[in-house]
Regions:
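Single, function-defining residue in the core of a domain
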Residues: 1-60, 74, 79, 84-87, ...
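Charge-biased, low-complexity intrinsically disordered regions
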Residues: 48, 66-69
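Residues within the helices of the helix-turn-helix
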Residues: 61, 65
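Short Pro/Gly-enriched beta-strand edge/turn motifs at strand-loop
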Residues: 137-143
Length: 295
């Protein structure tokens, strides 16, 4: 089955899901969309799917043109904004899981690097739309040179299949949230969906910590993590070495081996990578190529 047909199946499955009242019921905020209202739960969901940077009038015109049987009523922007608050965000998580499951169950073959699937984790601080609800949840910020300007920001994080060009899981968190905590959430989704076997997960600088590396080892994730130049593992590395993360009885941890590589770059600088992939057939040059897939 080609990707076009897989996408068609995903769209059809989402249509089937959102038109099934039994499946929608858990995602309705209690005491809302229960009486005969001007806007139904399905109509609000459809509007969210069709929303774009165009005006509300243009979005509604497109819905009425393409989905005339939906009988979308004339409503105000305020009414739509209020109604969307009564949809539980769990609906969109469920639709995301549905699409990921269908994609990987129907794709005829997955691309490989040296026999492995490749995933990359990354996060970014982003500015969010200004509204009372985002200010209430994410906090309100101001900045120089205009202290009167108010805005809010959050941490967006994803795990991405770099060879098959697919986002498996994404999340958004408060601005000061930990990128590592967000990454752990992605790894647990991989585990729940059974997609982490025979895979390597690539992490940028800032994700490495002994706890993070131990989690990958203990849960069967092969990983490659870029190290900061100033930490001891980087300072002690000269080429390709095996070190030991010492366990302690106090924390109930055992010794864990870690492979550290010094990779020369084209500009004359060096980067340092930590991994639990110990196969000597995977050389430094291959790790350099592997880490580049993250971009």
């Amino acid at each position: 089955m080609n990707r076009t047909n897989i996408c068609k199946n995903i769209v059809q499955s989402i249509k089937d899901y959102i038109t099934d009242q039994v499946k929608l019921e858990p995602h309705r905020v209690e005491k809302h969309f229960v009486r005969r209202r001007k806007l139904s739960l399905l109509q609000v969901i459809i509007y969210l799917f069709f929303s774009s940077k165009a005006s509300m009038f243009q979005n509604l015109s497109q819905i009425r043109e393409e989905l005339g049987t939906l009988s979308f009523p004339d409503v105000s922007k305020q009414a739509l904004s209020k109604a969307r608050q009564f949809i539980n965000p769990s609906l969109f998580k469920e639709l995301d899981y549905l699409s990921v499951d269908l994609f990987y169950s129907q794709i005829p073959s997955r691309k490989l690097w040296q026999g492995y699937h490749l995933f990359a984790v990354d996060g970014s601080r982003i500015e969010l739309p200004n509204s009372k609800s985002t200010f209430d949840f994410f906090g309100e910020m101001s900045s120089y040179p205009d202290p009167n300007r108010r805005y809010t920001m959050g941490l967006a994080s994803i795990i991405y299949d770099v060879l098959d060009d697919y986002i498996l899981h994404a999340s958004i968190h408060k601005f000061l949230s930990s990128e590592r905590a967000a990454a752990l959430e992605h790894l647990k989704v991989l585990e729940d969906m059974g997609l982490y076997n025979n895979s390597i997960i690539i992490f940028d600088r800032g994700y490495y910590s002994e706890d993070m590396f131990r989690y990958c080892v203990e849960h069967g994730h092969l990983c490659v993590m870029r190290l900061k130049e100033g930490i001891n593992l980087s300072k002690k590395c000269n080429g390709d070495m095996i070190s030991i993360l010492q366990g302690t009885s106090k924390e109930g941890t055992s010794d864990v081996p870690i492979r550290v590589l010094e990779i020369p770059l084209d500009d004359g600088t060096k980067e340092y990578l930590a991994t639990n992939l110990f196969d000597p057939a995977v050389t430094k040059d291959m790790f350099r190529e592997l880490y580049f897939y993250r971009w």
